[in-house]
C-alpha cells in the first residue's frame, strides 16, 4: 500500500506502524442529548450544566434530586465527554470526577465504548473532526446547531487502544500546561496580595 493511501499520522510514537481505522463516531461512543425541558432550578441539589459551562463543567445552578432521577436515566459519569451542540458547536470537555451533573439540550453526552476517553477528547478537538462537525452543523439555524444524529455520523480515525492511551495522555497533559501558562498573568498580579511569590 502506498504512503498516500495509508491512514497514518505524520508523527507518532515509536513502535506503532498499523494504519488507523476510519469509523463513524457512533461506533466509538453512544451519543445522547440533555433535557429539552426548562429546568426547575433549586438552591441546592444536582448541578445543572449547559453550553456556557463547558470549560469548567461547573455551575451555580441546581435541580432537585427528584427531578434528576425522573429526567436523567442516562447522565454524565467519570470518563464521559460533554460536547457543545447549540450556539457554540464542537467544544468538548471530559468528566474526571464523580460529581452528579444534569445537562441541558445544548450539550451532547458522549459515552465512550472501546475507545480511550482522553484520546476521544483529543480527537474531537482535531482539525479533521472539527471540519466534519462544521460540515454537519446547521448554520442557517439561529442559534446554529448540530443535531444529535449528525454527531453520530462524524467520521473519525482511530489507532490501537494502546496508541490511543499514549496520545490521549500526552495531549491532555499539554492542554493542562497551556491552561496553567494562560493563568500565569492573573497569578502574578495576585501574588503580592497573598504574600506568596508565584512568578
Stretch-by-stretch model annotation:
Residues 1-2, 11-15, 37, 141-143, ...:
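Short, recurring structural edge motifs at helix starts
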Residues 168-172, 176, 183:
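Acidic/polar-enriched heptad-repeat coiled-coil alpha-helices
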Residues 26-158:
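DNA target-recognition domains and sequence-specific DNA-contacting regions of bacterial/archaeal
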Residues 11-35:
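Non-catalytic DNA-recognition/assembly elements of restriction-modification systems
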Residues 20-23, 167, 178:
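Short sequence segments immediately N-terminal to proteolytic processing junctions that release a mature
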Residues 23, 60-61, 180-190:
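Short, tandemly repeated low-complexity microdomains enriched for cysteine and small residues
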Residues 1-18, 183-199:
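Short amphipathic coiled-coil heptad-repeat segments
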Amino acid at each position: 500500500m502506498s504512503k498516500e493511501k495509508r491512514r497514518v499520522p505524520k508523527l507518532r510514537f515509536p513502535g506503532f506502524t498499523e494504519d488507523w481505522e476510519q469509523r463513524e463516531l457512533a461506533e466509538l461512543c453512544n451519543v445522547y442529548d440533555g433535557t429539552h425541558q426548562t429546568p426547575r432550578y433549586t438552591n441546592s441539589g444536582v448541578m445543572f450544566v449547559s453550553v456556557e459551562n463547558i470549560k469548567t463543567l461547573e455551575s451555580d445552578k441546581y435541580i432537585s434530586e427528584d427531578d434528576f432521577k425522573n429526567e436523567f436515566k442516562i447522565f454524565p459519569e467519570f470518563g464521559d465527554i460533554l460536547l457543545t451542540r447549540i450556539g457554540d458547536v464542537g467544544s468538548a470537555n471530559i468528566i474526571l470526577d464523580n460529581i452528579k451533573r444534569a445537562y441541558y439540550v445544548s450539550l451532547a453526552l458522549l459515552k465512550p465504548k472501546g475507545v480511550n476517553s482522553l484520546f476521544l477528547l483529543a480527537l474531537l478537538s482535531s482539525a479533521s473532526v472539527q471540519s466534519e462537525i462544521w460540515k454537519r452543523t446547521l448554520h442557517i439555524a439561529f442559534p446554529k446547531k448540530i443535531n444529535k444524529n449528525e454527531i453520530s455520523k462524524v467520521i473519525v480515525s482511530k489507532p490501537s487502544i494502546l496508541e490511543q492511551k499514549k496520545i490521549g495522555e500526552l495531549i491532555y497533559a499539554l492542554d493542562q500546561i497551556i491552561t496553567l501558562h494562560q493563568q500565569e498573568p492573573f497569578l502574578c498580579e495576585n501574588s503580592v496580595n497573598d504574600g506568596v511569590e508565584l512568578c
